[in-house]
Amino acid sequence: MSNNAVKLESFTKKYAEKIACSSIDFTAGECSVTGLLGPNGAGKSTILKAICGEIYPTTGFVSVCGFSKPEDIKKIIGYVPEIPELEENLTVKETLVLEAGLYSVKDAVDRIKEALSICQLTDVVSCKVKNLSKGYRQRVSLAKALCSDPKVLVLDEFSAGLDPVQTVQLRNNIKKLSEKITVIFSTHHIEEAVSLCKDIYILKRGVIAAHGTAESIAKDNGCHNLEEAFLKVTGEGIIHE
């Protein structure tokens, strides 16, 4: 779609003398899936934190659904970190009820029911988080984000800890979610980006090394596919599933 839900203009972030990201121009359309690829330390997490309103740009501009103040952005963002941030002694249901309450979500019961269904959690709804596997914790983290009724969903390495079947199921659900909200995620997995994204950004050392569809990135770099292009522009190895 032509309307952008998320926009970064000339975004630069410095920590003391270290530049985490430099002159980043990034957009994510409404009701779309946008992927960030890159090796560790490339700047993916910095961009995600900026989109979530967790950090300020040193220079440049960040806009999410027309909002630029972090306190406004945080109200419309659902964030799923690579390592789930969950209260160990709460049950799955209690976790979601608490999250919906914090955001004063309308129709909270329906939102929770939908999140449980999307994340395949109905069979563990009464289980405490501390008794769940890593894969289940990741799904609870996603369900928690959905309960805040976000306009933009941000996922950092969302498939970490999931088995192949769970990964495919979650990808299918993300595609469905993108019919209603904007989804932005980071990943090391080429197949994940190809499967889900029409718009892909490849980062290297804090700058955008390539941007476009999987096909256009490959073509622009004289490669047969996105895997070859990723290796060429980053000089890194590739993670297959």
Give residue ranges: language-model regions.
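ABC ATPase "signature
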Residues: H211-G212
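Catalytic Walker B motif of ABC-type/P-loop ATPase nucleotide-binding domains
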Residues: L153-E157
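Conserved ABC transporter NBD signature motif
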Residues: T59-K75
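Helical segment within the ABC ATPase nucleotide-binding domain
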Residues: T167-E179
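Conserved ABC ATPase "signature" region
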Residues: V97, G101-V124
